[in-house]
Amino acid sequence: MAAGTTSDLRNGIVIRYNNDLYQVVEFQHVAPGNWRAFVRMKLKSLTTGKVIEDRVRAGAEIDIVRIERRPMQYLYREGDSFVFMDNDTFDQIPVSAELVGDAVKFMKENETVDLVYDAEKDQIIGVELPIFVNLKVVETTVAVRGDTATNVTKPATLETGAVIEVPAFINEGDVLKIDTRTGEYITRV
């Protein structure tokens, strides 16, 4: 655990705050007139996925957690856990569904993802997907002809079970590039 101050805050770093691990989603230094400066933070809990907003005095001490990302291959789901394989040692590591979170929507078997570890405790704190993944459309509705006055979208079910909005010209069997951060369609591959 590295001690730091609010001047060390950056988007994406992990801090220990109120006895939980949070990833900094957004922060803003505010100096209102003749009042004391403070830092407004938007934090995402790595254990629950809940996003909170809080503010702390500028210059306050914060605990920065050193994290480590290890590439692992997602093998299969077993009950309430997901099994990953270390690409170097070939050890199989079960990870609970709570730690996997929303990443499950875009995880395909045999794909490589990063397991995020708390480096001090050597404990898994989450799963990080690549920014873009290619997934196949397994089910979608047929577009209505003539309904093209605006950007028409329709729901499409991907091979992982996720449902996203896609343009009307997408058909079953198409492979799409998806942004895993937002869950949005990028392009057809």
Swiss-Prot record:
Involved in peptide bond synthesis. Stimulates efficient translation and peptide-bond synthesis on native or reconstituted 70S ribosomes in vitro. Probably functions indirectly by altering the affinity of the ribosome for aminoacyl-tRNA, thus increasing their reactivity as acceptors for peptidyl transferase. InterPro entries: Elong-fact-P_C, NA-bd_OB-fold, Rib_uL2_dom2, Transl_elong_fac_P/YeiP, Transl_elong_KOW-like, Transl_elong_P/YeiP_cen, Transl_elong_P/YeiP_CS, Transl_elongation_fac_P. Disulfide bonds: none annotated. This is Elongation factor P. It comes from Chloroflexus aggregans (strain MD-66 / DSM 9485). GO terms for biological process: peptide biosynthetic process. The keyword Cytoplasm applies. The gene is efp. Belongs to the elongation factor P family. Its main location: cytoplasm. It is found in: Cytoplasm. Keywords: Cytoplasm, Elongation factor, Protein biosynthesis. SMART domains: EFP, Elong-fact-P_C.
